[in-house]
């Protein structure tokens, strides 16, 4: 068995070589963290979708004070380089991630994707998942989807807490966060700034989606605990504001939508065994709402109530999870993996 400890403390010539694909908000954050961990990893390539960034130094694209000597390029050019891992930060969906992932594994590289659906990809894309698994095994590499949510807070962390139970009867977990730092696209997909009627129309038309990843998390939990659910029920309701709220991208008056309360329930014999909630809104403090991550597990002889206040930061958390899983993905058996197949996550320092 390969020593995980050895991978965690690797130095010098044993540094993991990494290519980052996608230089948006998350990809740029991952690139910065990789550069900060130069004693553990070496960034050998960076890929941007926009061709006007190609040929530029990564340090300039990231607006760093120094150049890195790494030229931003196309995916094909980056994959021609020797690397241990490619981190993909370009999309939320398996169908959009699939083609590039096949190119990555075809070049003999392990892949970490932060696409939310990739955390448990067979739920929405069973055929593509089978293709990815076959390609990874053929090329003796591993594919993993991860992030802070899905990937950690509302699935991996929940399951870790069940380890102290004789028997689990029910799980209720919620993540309450502030949307204010996010941009226009997130405001649109969460329905912020709409009227109640506009919100409901957006739900019907699919322009207001709420949280991407709930189906992955609830199925991951159920599979890990051996629960065969009868049905999974999702609801998305508008969070109406009683006060005026404002961000650089949207203004919300009283009676308008300040966010989306997205809930998913895993049902067995008419009972909700798993309930996951993700109410997201701008400036929740204006109505006295505390942000945080909350997990309640009921067992046959004990219960656990865990609260993290404020919530684990979504951006920083996802960036960290992508980087922290590098040594585990490098050491993992070939194939398409999930967080259920990995050692418990920890800081890669």
Language-model features: locations:
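Conserved N-terminal Rossmann-fold NAD(P) cofactor-binding segment
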Residues: 50-81
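Rossmann-fold NAD(P) dinucleotide-binding segment
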Residues: 79-85, 94-116
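Short, ordered loop/turn segments at secondary-structure junctions
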Residues: 91, 109, 115-119, 148-149, ...
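Active-site-lining helix/loop region of Rossmann-like oxidoreductase modules
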Residues: 21, 162-287, 291-293, 307, ...
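C-terminal helical cap and adjacent loop that interface with cofactors, partners, or active-site loops
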Residues: 282-349
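N-terminal Rossmann-like dinucleotide-binding module
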Residues: 2-62
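Rossmann-fold NAD(P)-binding glycine/threonine-rich loop
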Residues: 116-140
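Short glycine-/small-residue-rich Rossmann-like dinucleotide-binding loops
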Residues: 90-91, 277
């Amino acid at each position: 068995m390969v020593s995980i400890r050895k991978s965690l403390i690797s130095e010098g010539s044993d540094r993991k070589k990494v290519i980052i694909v996608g230089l948006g908000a998350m990809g740029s954050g991952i690139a910065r963290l990789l550069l900060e961990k130069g004693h553990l990893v070496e960034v050998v390539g960076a890929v941007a979708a926009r061709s006007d960034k190609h040929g530029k130094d990564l340090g300039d694209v990231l607006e760093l004070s120094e150049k890195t000597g790494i030229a931003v390029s196309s995916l094909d050019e980056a994959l021609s380089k020797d690397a241990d891992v490619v981190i993909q930060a370009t999309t939320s969906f398996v169908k959009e991630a699939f083609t590039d992932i096949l190119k990555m594994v075809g070049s003999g590289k392990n892949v970490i994707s932060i696409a939310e659906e990739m955390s448990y990809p067979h739920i929405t894309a069973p055929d593509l998942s089978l293709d990815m698994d076959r390609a990874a095994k053929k090329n003796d590499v591993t594919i993993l989807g991860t992030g802070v949510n899905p990937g950690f807070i509302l699935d991996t962390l929940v399951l870790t807490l069940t380890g102290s139970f004789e028997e689990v009867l029910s799980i209720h977990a919620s993540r309450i966060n502030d949307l204010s730092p996010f941009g226009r696209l997130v405001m649109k997909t969460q329905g912020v700034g709409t009227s109640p009627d506009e919100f409901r129309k957006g739900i019907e038309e699919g322009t207001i989606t709420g949280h991407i990843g709930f189906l992955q998390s609830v199925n991951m939990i159920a599979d890990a605990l051996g629960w065969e659910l009868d049905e999974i029920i999702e609801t998305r309701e508008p969070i109406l504001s009683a006060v005026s709220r404002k961000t650089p991208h949207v203004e919300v008056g009283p009676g308008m939508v300040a966010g989306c309360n997205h809930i998913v329930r895993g049902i067995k014999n008419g009972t909700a065994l798993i309930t996951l909630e993700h109410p997201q809104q701008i400036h929740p403090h204006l109505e006295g709402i505390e942000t945080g991550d909350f997990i309640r597990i009921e067992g046959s002889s004990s219960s656990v109530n865990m609260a993290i206040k404020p919530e684990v930061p979504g951006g920083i958390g996802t960036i960290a999870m992508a980087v922290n899983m590098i040594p585990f993905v490098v050491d993992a058996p070939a194939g398409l993996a999930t967080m259920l197949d990995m050692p418990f996550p920890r800081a890669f320092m």
